[in-house]
């Protein structure tokens, strides 16, 4: 009796919490608009009272969204089935982790997470940007507030997660079984930290375009930490999603050029270009217009990805169920934000640019070519993603653009960019001697040629694309160590002097080297896993042996299994690899709440590759005969290891930049935006 009354009390509290969350979300719409109005008018009039109001309102906006999000999360935790969103996406028997992740495992909740992260970034700008010119800061917060208002309105008018149903349901439908995985619990927050983070350089770019007297190179110094932070989270989010698809979907691959995968990959490419262009803008006071344009494009691609996922125009394992009203709203918002920004850029960009003050042979030129290649790669992915939609809209005909297109157009652009990433640090700023730079890279070139020749001989002239890919990774690895050796003057001074130089190097230099080393590891993983992958698909009986890549695999049969909220069958494989003997299990599950089947792969991961087994359906006549797919994916784990190392390098650089850059120093802000001081 006591337990029942306690449960009823929790439900009553949850219902009150939902009303509080709904009220907070409604109030936040007005506060967001207020932030935008006071920030813009206050900065234009240089009215300190209005500027202060925009500061305080930004904090209130963040607090209200936190309250709304926590209210919805509480409803999921206590299983308040009077809330429609909880009914559709949760179940009382789900583990606590999946009840919590169910908050953002649906369209409405994930949008609320988007706004939460957006307002969190605004709050961080307010806290960490207290040394920025007040006029600029209020303008940036106003733009952030305007973006937040647009998304809050989208939630309230088309995607409200706080709607109730009466009478309350006895239980819920449960989260999509495919999403009931620890990887997917953390994937959306990481991805959104990157996605939404691109709003910060966008807001700074628009604020710069609205300034009365232009800006100088300090603008790039302001945005670089935010771009780097977003890039790191986007790298982690994309790689975690790829890893999840690899082990959860049972198809043995790690990237399928799915439209929704591309929707997150395009902002990553644009932010990578932005990261490099901001270096030139900061160091050489050049490419300022290009940097601002990339800031606009990177965030616009994030909005485009949101439209593609939530409008219903795409069919994908990642896409949310949606309706036309949502698509129209997001499309209109995308057109207003992107179109308005590009018009403003066209009107104001000329006043921001300076003359080109570097020669064709210089580090600036190399970074510019790098930017062009990344931008072209972004355009090719964008074209391949949107082309089926364009053809369907114009000719009412369905087509698909698959991996062959993307591989054919993406590789010729990415390979030169990777080669340049090793070569450009050898060039000097403004003007450089090409022969000196080539001499510095001589040993890297020799090692690369030796590696390519050795593999070509060992492979007897076969697998040439894979051999060239290994050579590319070798070139990049050698380039990282060569660049580091140049920085510490290794071989030019005594050893202890080189160690002293290494000790005094800024963390951003270490971070760059680590990130580029991560790219090399990624290249090795992609090359080897793609070129030397082995696959077997066949029907087998219990006791039958399969030989694959030095593995001796015995299929021992199928047993019935039961989980906390699913029933299934488990295929058992006895594997012998040299002196090692182990078991791998693959399962076919049916989740009780939704009656939806899923496949769980059995994976044995080693540093040199994965053995990957998947159990299929049985033969309709001979029930013991089973379809199995077995893959050997060499070095596939290096793909995610490389991505993690890249993000780690970014965070190492970020830890340095937040302390040494003028973003937190009033000294570096002097003579900036002088007309507005």
Feature roles, as predicted:
Residues 2-15:
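Short, Lys/Arg-enriched N-terminal segments with co-localized hydrophobic residues
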Residues 12-677:
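Solvent-exposed, non-transmembrane regions of integral membrane proteins
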């Amino acid at each position: 009796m006591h337990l029942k009354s306690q449960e009823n009390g929790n439900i009553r509290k949850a219902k009150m919490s939902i009303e509080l969350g709904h009220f907070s979300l409604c109030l936040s719409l007005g506060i967001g608009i207020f932030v935008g109005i006071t920030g813009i008018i206050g900065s234009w009039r240089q009215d300190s009272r209005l500027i202060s109001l925009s500061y305080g309102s930004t904090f209130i906006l963040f607090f209200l969204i936190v309250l709304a999000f926590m209210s919805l999360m509480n409803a999921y935790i206590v299983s308040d089935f009077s809330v429609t969103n909880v009914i559709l996406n949760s179940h009382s028997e789900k583990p606590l982790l999946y009840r919590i992740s169910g908050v953002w495992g649906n369209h409405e909740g994930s949008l609320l997470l988007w706004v939460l992260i957006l307002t969190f970034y605004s709050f961080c700008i307010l806290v960490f940007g207290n040394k920025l010119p007040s006029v600029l800061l209020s303008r940036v917060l106003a733009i952030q507030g305007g973006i937040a208002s647009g998304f809050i309105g989208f939630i309230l008018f088309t995607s409200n997660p706080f709607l109730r149903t009466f009478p309350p349901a006895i239980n819920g439908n449960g989260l999509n079984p495919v999403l009931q995985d620890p990887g997917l619990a953390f994937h959306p927050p990481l991805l959104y930290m990157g996605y939404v983070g691109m709003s910060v350089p966008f807001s700074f770019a628009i604020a710069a375009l609205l300034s009365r007297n232009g800006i100088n190179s300090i603008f790039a110094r302001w945005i670089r930490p935010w771009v780097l932070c977003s890039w790191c989270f986007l790298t982690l989010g994309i790689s975690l999603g790829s890893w999840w698809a690899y082990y959860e979907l049972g198809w043995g691959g790690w990237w399928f050029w799915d439209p929704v995968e591309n929707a997150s990959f395009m902002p990553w490419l644009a932010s990578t270009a932005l990261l490099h262009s901001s270096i030139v803008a900061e160091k050489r006071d050049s490419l300022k217009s290009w940097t601002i344009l990339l800031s606009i494009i990177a965030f616009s691609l994030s909005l485009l990805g949101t439209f593609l996922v939530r409008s219903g125009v795409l069919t994908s394992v990642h896409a949310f169920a949606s309706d036309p009203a949502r698509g129209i709203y997001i499309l209109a918002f995308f057109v207003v934000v992107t179109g308005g920004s590009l018009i403003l850029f066209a009107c104001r960009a000329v006043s921001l640019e300076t003359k080109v003050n570097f020669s064709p042979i210089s580090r600036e030129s190399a970074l510019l070519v790098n930017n062009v290649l990344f931008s072209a790669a972004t355009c090719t992915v964008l074209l391949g993603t949107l082309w089926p939609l364009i053809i369907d809209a114009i000719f009412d005909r369905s087509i698909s653009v698959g991996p062959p297109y993307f591989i054919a157009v993406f590789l010729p652009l990415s390979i030169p960019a990777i080669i340049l990433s090793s070569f450009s640090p050898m060039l000097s700023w403004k003007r450089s001697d090409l022969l000196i730079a080539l001499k510095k890279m001589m040993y890297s070139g020799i090692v690369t040629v030796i590696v390519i020749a050795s593999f070509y001989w060992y492979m007897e002239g076969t697998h040439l694309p894979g051999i060239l890919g290994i050579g590319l990774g070798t070139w990049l690895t050698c380039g990282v160590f060569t660049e580091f050796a140049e920085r510490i003057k290794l071989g030019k001074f005594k050893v202890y002097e080189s160690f002293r130089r290494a000790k005094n190097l800024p963390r951003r230099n270490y971070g760059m080297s680590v990130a580029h080393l991560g790219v090399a590891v990624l290249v090795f993983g992609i090359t080897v896993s793609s070129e030397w992958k082995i696959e077997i698909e066949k029907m087998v009986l219990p006791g039958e042996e399969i030989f694959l890549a030095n593995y001796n695999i015995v299929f021992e049969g199928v047993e019935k299994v039961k989980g906390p909220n699913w029933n299934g069958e488990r295929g058992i494989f006895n594997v012998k690899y040299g002196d090692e003997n182990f078991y791998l299990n693959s399962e076919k599950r049916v989740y009780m709440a939704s009656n939806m089947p899923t496949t769980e792969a059995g994976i044995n991961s080693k540093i040199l590759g994965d053995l990957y087994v998947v159990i299929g359906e049985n033969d309709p006549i001979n029930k013991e005969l089973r379809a199995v797919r077995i893959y050997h994916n060499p070095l596939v784990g290096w793909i995610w290891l490389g991505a993690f190392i890249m993000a780690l390098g970014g965070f190492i650089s970020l830890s340095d930049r937040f302390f040494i850059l003028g973003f937190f120093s009033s000294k570096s802000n002097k003579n900036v935006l002088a007309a507005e001081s």
